[in-house]
Every structure is written in structure tokens, then in C-alpha cells.
Amino acid sequence: KTKKTTLCAGNIATAEAAKFLIKLGVDIVKVGIGPGSICTTRLVAGIGVPQLSAIIEVKKGVKNKKTKIISDGGIKYSGDIAKALSAGADAVMIGSLFAGSLETPGKLIKKNNKLYKSFRGMGSVGAMNKGSADRYFQTKQKDTSKYVPEGVEGFVKYKGNVKSIIYKLIGGLKSSMGYLGAKKITFLKNKPNFVKITKAGFYESMVHNVDEVKNESKY
């Protein structure tokens, strides 16, 4: 490592891994093993930690303010961004929420009079055929039928311009900060109070007892 180079390494899910990387001189650690919507690592390898728990655990290993934490994956709603930042992340990486936007490279496809965009995980066969096999130590495997994928390919609804998506995500984050009285994003980390909820509590948190939702929000 040189002073002019910023190093980012991952993905990890434990405090021990964070300490190990920091000793090597890493400036940024990425947290997340299997939380992505198109990732199958937890099914294929049996490895992974629920994302919020992983962030909290990694934060225990990051004692200095210079080392930053990026939460990679698991963002389904704007509220998940607030939770990740409150748990200790300095930033989040978002994939699936942006996958259906105009700016993404996926092909625009029409199915049943609805528009979709193709979306694939870096561990999918399609992505490995395009060069991501090295991430999974499978570059020596010339027979692509023998790839062991840790991701899938699929389609997501077309969402239009990415600006509208970002606008709603920022709005949700601001709303969360307002509820918590946090004037700055950094204030979210001031002893957050996380509460475990039951399945009934989760159901109550979602839209319910409604047959049809008009002007559905993307949260």
C-alpha cells in the first residue's frame, strides 16, 4: 500500500475479518455475503450472515474513524439504507433497486405488454462467461457447463430514469432522519435502538388488508 492509494477489500461479515484487513492497510471494508437479490451464495456455499447483523459485527472490529464501511447488498427499501447507516455503515451499495432503470446496461424487453430489463448477478453463469469467473476461482474451468454459479439471471420491471428512484430513496432516508432527530447522517450512529420483530410484526409493517394499491411507491 502507498499513501496515494485507497484500498477497498471485501466482502466480509465478521469483526475478525475487519481487523485482519485493517492490519494490511485497507482503507475501506465491504460488508455482505449473500444478501443480494440475485445472489445464491448462502444456498450454494452455506456461507453468509444476515446483512444488518453483519454490519453490526464488522463495526466491532473497526475501532478507528479512518476506516470506512460499505454495506454491499440487501437494500430493498429506503428504510434499509437508514438501518444500514445506523448499524455502522458509512455508505451502501445498491444493485436491484437500480437494475430496472433506463441507465443500466441490461436489455429492455417487453413481456405481456410490460417492460422489463435483464438483470444478472456477478456469480451467474452469464456473468462468468463475460469475465467474472476469476472472482469465484473458476477461470481454469474451460467447460462452462461445469461452472458452479453463486448467482442467477432474471428480469426486473422497467422503472424509467434513475433520478426518480434516487429521489425517493433520499426522501425515505430524510424521513428516517427526521423521526430520529438526526440533523446529519453521522448522527444516525448515535446508539441506535434496534428491536427484533415477529413475523406478525413484519406483516403489520407492510401494506395489508388492501386488495389493490394505487400509485404503488418504490419506497
Predicted regions: what they are:
Residues 2-3, 8, 24, 46-71, ...:
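Alpha/beta catalytic cores of nucleotide-metabolism and tRNA/nucleoside-modifying enzymes
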Residues 15-27:
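Short amphipathic alpha-helices and their capping/turn segments at secondary-structure boundaries
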Residues 26-35, 94-95:
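Non-cysteine beta-strand/loop elements that form the S-adenosyl-L-methionine
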